[in-house]
Design a protein with these regions (language model features):
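Helix N-cap/beta->alpha junction signal
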Residues: 15, 87-88
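Conserved active-site segments centered on acidic
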Residues: 1-79, 147
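Hydrophobic beta-strand core positions in alpha/beta domains
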Residues: 6, 84-85
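Phosphate-binding/catalytic loops
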Residues: 82, 88-148
Length: 148
């Protein structure tokens, strides 16, 4: 079974949304995969996803059950087969922390899609449309990633 970790900064908007979407898409496509999410900072550790992210995702039928924010741990670089970053800043942070022998596991989530976007924009300080855009980008990338 492949293990996938999705990472953003605080693990309350983008990466938990990606976790929820990947779980649902994997179940639909009958792909046996373990999915988790984390943040590069631990400020929101133990908190549920941002209410706006959760509301947008639930409107599309995704479950955020059991998802709580956590900071990435050193053992994650060993445990997971794929570590997908939401943006270049978080990818750089991951590359700085990741042992050389596991660097091949790191990539931008959107590098696995046909999107014109390279990064998933952080919707935290924006309006509702930002959360919808995150879902649009993540849905496309999740399906393409799982079908590879």
């Amino acid at each position: 079974m492949q293990k996938v970790l999705v990472v953003c900064m605080g693990n309350i908007c983008r990466s938990p949304t990606a976790e929820a979407v990947l779980r649902a898409k994997a179940a639909q496509l009958k792909v046996d995969v373990e999915i988790d999410s984390a943040g590069t900072i631990g400020y929101h550790q133990g908190n549920p996803p941002d209410a706006r992210s959760k509301a947008a995702g639930e409107k599309r039928g995704y479950s955020f059950s059991g998802i709580k924010a956590r900071k990435i741990r050193d053992e994650d670089f060993v445990k997971f087969d794929w570590i997908l970053a939401a943006d270049k800043e978080n990818l750089a942070e991951l590359k700085a922390r990741c042992p050389q022998s596991h660097q091949h596991k790191l990539s931008l989530m959107l590098s696995h899609s046909d999107s014109e976007y390279q990064e998933i924009p952080d919707p935290y300080y924006g309006g509702e449309r930002g959360f919808e855009l995150v879902l649009d980008l993540v849905e496309d990338a999740a399906e393409q990633f799982l079908l590879k």
